[in-house]
Design a protein with these regions (language model features):
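Transmembrane beta-barrel architecture of outer-membrane proteins
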Residues: 85-90, 117, 155-159, 211-215, ...
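Short secondary-structure junction motifs
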Residues: 117, 171, 228-230, 265, ...
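Outer-membrane beta-barrel pore domains
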Residues: 75-78, 133, 145-150, 262-448
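Beta-barrel outer-membrane channel/assembly domains of diderm bacteria
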Residues: 28-168, 218, 352, 366, ...
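Surface-exposed coil loops of outer-membrane beta-barrel proteins
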Residues: 64-81, 131-260, 269-272, 276, ...
Length: 448
């Protein structure tokens, strides 16, 4: 990428940095999410009288790689192109029920609220990342997206759900609608801490999981005495991966277990999803499941599981280990490895060190393996011919960054990531010319 191109891209970031400064100067709320509208008379009334918060964030970044192509996939996921990327411009409105258990997060300490309550969430996202939040049968055919190329910005209604709290068992939460997946250590939205969004790029295990679901998710906490550890469970029935309209008409089942230590410093999360993936991937809209398998009339069972253990060592240091395993029957790309089914698994280790109140250092190491190609991002599909030339085998990645919040509403993050691919098929990086690649990035996120 040329110096001139970097200067032009830096000019694109300038408005985001300026907006962050203005928002922080005018915002009165301690929470950066909702601070812009929350500082107005209307926002205060919505929050105080109805418990409703209007919030948003804007994320953009610059990316550079060490080869002659502009291809920064797969290790820069969500990003694919070198240069400037408007990743996410999101707007949301929500009301959270008073509860001691939160769907997708788990149980919390404290007494169980004795009254039922309700809430809702609607989150819209525009940008390069939004294409990964499209839901087949919901927002893939919106007019604003209809003529888009796969690499273009998209608009999605990423979440639209109702939420109900019931004072049963140790506390229960029911979500109905379209919501971000409860699986994986990382999440796709560029939210502020303490959300697990410490890196600009994402892991291979995150890439190989679902982004969102349409259906129902029931979460509950077992009764526990003050000072005891907490145990929660989640059970869900959804329309597969990233689908509202299931072509094979077979629901997927989610089953998760979440344990929290009494001091809330250690978390254990075991997350699972199982169902028929036959015909649930759609090339014409680049949506649905990213793992094509058979047709809607086929049975192509898909299973994925994640186990994440995180621990707060002390006020300044936190670690997390995630392992994952998945299997796709009758994978459409598995034949390139002379297989019928595809299996993938891996592990990643995360270390987070707080240097000061507004500066942290984050590092991550990952190993990931696929015995056959399964994911469309790894398929390297020729845009002219539609013919895949996939990569598979072992992937090794090391990522490190600094996350700085000069003001509560603005996160600045320089990041370096180095990946190595060892395996058959096409070299994974540099448009098929490299088996290793260095990616440097800088992203800015404004919370409002």
């Amino acid at each position: 990428m040329s110096t001139r191109a970097f200067k032009n891209a830096a000019l694109c970031l300038a408005p985001i940095l300026t907006i962050g400064t203005l928002i922080s100067a005018s915002a009165l709320a301690a929470d950066p999410l909702g601070s812009l509208v929350g500082s107005t008379a209307l926002g205060k009334q919505l929050k105080e009288d109805y418990g409703v918060k209007v919030y948003g964030w804007a994320q953009a970044g610059l990316i550079y790689n060490n080869n002659s192509t502009d291809d920064v996939s797969k290790q820069a996921f969500f990003n694919t192109d070198e240069g400037f990327n408007l990743n996410q411009f999101a707007l949301g409105i929500q009301r959270s029920p008073a509860s001691n258990v939160q769907g997708r997060i788990g149980p919390f300490p404290g007494p169980m609220p004795q009254e039922a309550d309700w809430g809702f969430n609607v989150t819209t996202v525009y940008g390069k990342d939004a294409r990964y939040f499209k839901t087949y049968g919901w927002d893939e055919d919106l007019g604003v997206n209809r003529d888009n190329k796969p690499e273009d910005e998209a608009f999605t209604i990423a979440q639209a759900y109702l939420e109900f709290y019931f004072p049963v068992l140790g506390g229960s939460d029911l979500m109905l609608g379209i919501f971000h997946t409860p699986l994986e250590n990382e999440i796709g939205f560029a939210l502020p801490s303490p959300a697990p969004t410490d890196f600009y790029s994402h892991t291979y295990s995150f890439m190989h999981g679902p982004a969102k679901h349409a259906g129902a998710l029931y979460s509950f906490k077992l009764p526990s005495a003050p000072g005891e550890s907490m145990l929660g469970f989640e059970v869900g029935v959804v329309q597969g991966w990233n689908n509202l309209q299931s072509e094979n008409h077979d629901p997927h089942v989610i089953a998760n277990v979440r344990w929290r230590s009494a001091d809330f410093g250690t978390w254990v999360d075991w997350e699972n999803i199982y169902g028929n993936g036959g015909g649930d991937s759609f090339a014409n809209c680049a949506c649905g499941s990213p793992m094509p398998a058979g047709t809607e009339d086929d049975t192509a069972q898909r299973y994925e599981t994640y186990l994440t253990i995180s621990h707060q060592l002390d006020p300044a240091n936190r670690i997390a280990v995630e392992t994952s395993y998945g299997k796709q029957k009758n994978g459409a790309l598995a034949g390139f490895a002379n297989k019928t089914d595809a299996t993938w698994y891996g592990a990643n280790f995360n270390f987070h060190h707080k240097l000061s109140e507004n500066l942290s250092w984050n590092s991550r190491a990952e190993w990931f393996y696929t015995d056959a190609p399964v994911h469309v991002v790894m398929a390297n599909i020729d845009s002219r011919t539609g013919i895949p030339d996939p990569s598979w085998g072992s992937f090794y990645a090391v990522t490190t960054n600094l996350s700085w919040l000069p003001i509560p509403n603005l996160r600045l993050r320089p990041e370096a990531r180095y990946d190595i691919h060892s395996g058959p098929g096409r070299d994974a990086f540099g448009d098929g010319s490299r088996d290793a690649q260095l990616v440097l990035s800088f992203d800015a996120t404004v919370f409002f």
